[in-house]
Amino acid sequence: MTNIQSILIANRGEIALRVIRTARAMGIRTVAVYSDADASSPHVRAADVAVRLGPAPASESYLSVPALLAAAREAGADAVHPGYGFLSENAGFAEACHAAGLTFIGPPAEVISALGRKDAARELAEQADVPVLRSYRADEVPGDVFPVLVKAASGGGGKGMRIVREPEALAEALSAAEREAESAFGDGTLLVERYLEHGRHVEVQILADSHGTVVHLGERDCSVQRRHQKVVEESPAPTISADLRERLLDAAVRLCRKVGYVNAGTVEYIVSGEEFFFLEVNTRLQVEHSVTELVTGLDLVELQIRVARGERLPQLSARSDGHAVEVRVYAEDAAHGFLPQAGTADVVRWPAETAALRVDTALRSGGEVTAYYDPMVAKVTAHGVDREDARRNLLGALADTEISGLTTNLPFLRTLLASAEFADAGIDTSWLDTHPDLPFHPRLEPDGPTPFDAQDGWRLGGPRLPARAAAERTGVRGAASAEADGSVRAPMPGTVLAVKAQPGQRVVAGEPLGVLEAMKMEHTLTAPHDGLVTEVGAAVGDQVPLGRLLFHVQAEASS
């Protein structure tokens, strides 16, 4: 039996707080780590000890294995919990922890290595008789198999992933996906698979101990996605038959037994009708583990720690009690392609937690969301006796949530959960991409100018009084921008990856002008209207701040 008395959490934000909460309940000392950008973050104050890693960039802090190992030595930790993201699925980090005499709270390094790459995991799935989608070499994709999905062999989270519908678009998609994967994971290797247009994303929660016991804790449906990243997750999956459920649960256990899996993990599938196909294995705790915890009554972090100690798993029931739905609250602009946002949240108000409502967050009033890390700021999860009860509970919780001063997807989430499509469980993985306007009310024609449009204020009698207010979009889009000046500015700090337009070039509305990388994702900058490019304000490789003028398009005079 391994003695674990002090855990270093190699992560930040809400997952660090989540691990601290369970460790403290188990009487285990906790060690937080932080970058300069996170020096005053809640997880730093919540831990028993906190150690600085380095500057704000993740490569110099949360992704620095030497810095993390040095922090563990300095704080006297004897175990490391990786959380999710960052180094959580890095076999080299797990091996380095083992070599340093630290217990890694996750699968063995060799298992992470075997399953961490999608191409290797695919081969193992085939050996375990788990169905897989047909794949192709990037230079040998037949013209009659489109659409196809290009995805990174390493990592996840939608990075390095592109849907390609026509053969002529494949080369550019491969180039962009390779750049993004190399930046996010240090590995630009890609896979190309047949893309299922209206599939559902269903995954199985696995738990295994070092004594040969492998169990599943039911499945989750994660089909509501944007940019190939999950937005809403729920358990149990609402649309699959009992027979399909049994087959995909059995396949997940079979695969994990074959590879000698230990600790918590998730086997992900794409489901179409009564068929299911293997996607990948996430060798870590998932963001959406909270829905499983609410329907099973289990603490997955506690079970992770007990397994890492060498304990046998207790008798666990996979029976679901009711239904749970989780939403991810992101600092992003849903009205403009879910573009990540950075800034300060002036006022933050979360709903009160109850037995049926859980809020996982590190964002407080005055908290800052930086461009250095993932823009997820919270998870809000509701439980109910059935799916409709859980949905209504979650809608009520979101109505009681307020974030002012920072653009978030809260209005979008409220509209989405209230939609008939979500209530009827009719949303598949492509829904948000193929129905970009459905989460919003119909577009409204702009009104004429009014005094309220004045940017410097106006007064109609009465005394002048100071006031401050925060506005929140209700989900209504305007049909046009009456005063668009043609300026295309950097929506957040980032690196210019491509410049596709030059001064003097005529462009049409929506035509790509350039590509900006921010938060490890590529964002295509497009022309706001038909016109002539009169200015290009950056070159490839430039680091640009928020608001930097990158392009200017002079509108063509209407005839």
Feature map (PLM): residue ranges:
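A glycine-rich phosphate-binding loop feature that marks nucleotide/adenosyl-phosphate handling sites
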Residues: 86, 90, 114, 193-200, ...
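Long hydrophobic segments that form regular secondary structure
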Residues: 210-211, 245-276, 346, 353-401
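N-terminal beta-alpha lobe that positions the nucleotide/phosphoryl donor
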Residues: 1-267, 271-286
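Flexible, low-complexity "carrier/transfer arms" centered on conserved reactive residues
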Residues: 349, 395-530, 537-539, 543-559
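Active-site "cap" helix and flanking loop/linker of ATP-utilizing ligase/carboxylase catalytic domains
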Residues: 240-274, 282-334, 415
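Glycine-rich active-site loop/lid that clamps phosphate-bearing ligands
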Residues: 313, 317-373, 426, 430, ...
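Flexible, glycine/charged-enriched surface loops at secondary-structure junctions
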Residues: 83, 187-193, 261-267, 313-320, ...
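Short, well-ordered beta-strand elements within core beta-sheets of diverse protein domains
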Residues: 161-163, 194, 240, 376-385, ...
